[in-house]
A protein has these predicted regions:
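Conserved beta-strand edge residues that scaffold enzyme active sites
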Residues: 1, 32, 83-84, 121-122, ...
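Glycine-rich, proline-tolerant flexible connector loops at the mouths of alpha/beta enzymes
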Residues: 1-18, 81-88
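Short, solvent-exposed loop/turn segments at secondary-structure boundaries
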Residues: 2-7, 53, 88-93, 151-154, ...
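Vicinal oxygen chelate
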Residues: 3-5, 44, 180-186
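Soluble or luminal CAZymes and related metallo-dependent hydrolases
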Residues: 6, 10, 54-61, 95-99, ...
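Histidine-acidic metal/acid-base catalytic patches
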Residues: 12, 19-22, 36, 101, ...
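Active-site acidic/histidine proton-transfer and metal-coordination neighborhood
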Residues: 19-20, 36-139
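Conserved alpha-helical segments that form or flank metal/cofactor-binding pockets of metalloenzymes
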Residues: 25-28
Length: 247
């Protein structure tokens, strides 16, 4: 939500629209001016709380988003934190830890949790970061396609590793980049069921880890709204049929 819309009046109006549509708000995602997903290199430089030059301002903005989520009655905020530095002894990593702890303490004061979206780190590095932060309101929004799109690991194996921290999920699909280009070039997002995630296996694994929360469909083609709506509709049908099959 943009700054000008983060008001009590806007929250009241939005809640009314959601109520009329039968929609329950399960998470409020934060995003920032200046972020770009044009390619992986640009994503590293611009996304989330990792870029040092924008970190302080973005932490403050996430605090305001947390306050707005509270007005909406939502106990979960989420974001792409960015590419967490690999060197856990570096000053950049330690400063990111401190900023994340500061943000989480504010979020906790609103009786909320923060879910980090997967994809930009391997499962092991994400677990290291969560454990280093040492806050009990830091969890994961698991997006299986992002593991493929970023080339950071098999999504099912990653889900098994991080399962105890998963509090929300995306249902999104994608195909791997060519061998030798994974992690350097994007994979390709595709309609649910057409990619390399393996949706039935994904849902079965969610059951195995005890996940019983919402299955949030994400289809990131805002430039083609009609196709986006059609793909989301097909995704609903696929998930319903798979859930019936799995039981």
């Amino acid at each position: 939500p943009h700054q000008e819309t983060r008001t009590a009046e806007s929250a009241e109006k939005f809640l009314k629209r959601c109520e009329d549509a039968g929609i329950t708000i399960t998470a409020v995602f934060g995003g920032f001016e200046g972020e770009s997903y044009a390619d992986i290199e640009t994503t590293v430089k611009t996304v989330g709380l990792v870029p040092e030059e924008t970190r302080s301002a973005r932490v403050q903005e996430m605090k305001e988003i947390s306050d707005f989520a509270k007005l909406l009655g939502c106990d979960t905020v989420a974001l792409h934190i960015g590419f967490v530095p690999e060197d856990r002894e570096s000053a950049n990593y330690k400063n990111l830890l401190a900023s994340t702890q500061d943000l989480l303490d504010h979020i906790a004061s609103n009786s909320q949790q923060l879910n980090l979206e997967t994809g930009q780190e391997t499962a092991d590095h994400l677990l290291d970061f969560i454990n280093d932060v040492k806050r009990d309101n830091l969890f994961i929004n698991f997006d299986p396609a992002n593991m493929i799109l970023y080339g950071t690991g098999d999504p099912i194996e990653a889900l098994k590793k991080v399962g105890k921290f998963v509090r929300s999920v995306h249902c999104k699909d994608g195909t791997w980049a060519a061998e030798g280009k994974r992690g350097k070039e994007w994979g390709c997002e595709v309609p649910l069921g057409d990619g390399d995630v393996g949706m039935e296996n994904y849902l079965r694994t969610l059951d195995e880890i005890g996940y019983a929360g919402p299955l949030t469909i994400e289809r990131e083609i805002p430039e083609d709204r009609e196709r986006q709506k059609a793909d989301i509709g097909q995704a609903v049908d696929l998930l319903v049929s798979l859930k019936e099959k799995i039981g």
